[in-house]
């Protein structure tokens, strides 16, 4: 399973790290991620601003994740 995690803070790092521990998850795409997520196995950072909803939609369409987890409040409020 591919998972998309939106955000770049400590909360999103913890979520992505835990998701990556599942044997069902083969890749976690983190947008934008941080230096810590860049070092984790099975995690891949993508430089997309969490407030740029059209870019996030393009990323989701390109990556086709089976699950998306939104960490920060800004993209939740933006839709």
Q: What are the residue ranges of the model-derived segments?
A:
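ATP-binding N-terminal substructure of ATP-dependent carboxylate-amine bond-forming enzymes
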Residues: 1-79
